[in-house]
Amino acid sequence: VMWPADIEQKARHIIRDFTARGLKLATAESCTGGLIVGALTEVAGSSSVIDRGFVTYSNEAKIEMLGVAGETLAAHGAVSRETAVEMALGTVTNSAADFAVAVTGIAGPSGGSAEKPVGLVHLAAAGRDGAMRHREMRYGDLGREAIRLATVRTALDLVAELAHAP
């Protein structure tokens, strides 16, 4: 797979850093469909860091695999801060990971609305210690591939940031 150089570099940095610190990472992906864990496992030595990756495209998968509350999805929708946070927490709970990152968004070309346009992505990273970061990105209607790659970049940045939070 040919990843953009900056994504490859971010993934390598995380694998090196987590390896040195004996940390494990898991992912939960909706709009990226496994691209985040794909970029990370492209790096040699990633098997000592990556515990698992959930691809929870449907609401049912978010509920069954990650324990996202049906009420959260009903009240806030799949693409929301609340859902991203529950996805990240559920990933930590349902894995052996020290840190988890979760993404949910609208990659387009359809599925957008005035309140939730194409290019809206919610990302959350959680630590087993209770640390949490959320980021709302509005990438705009850049096209499906560009939105998905931009989400991978932001997710990797969020993981690196949380893993080094004071």
Task: Give the location of each predicted region.
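Short alpha-helical segments enriched in small residues
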Residues: 1-166
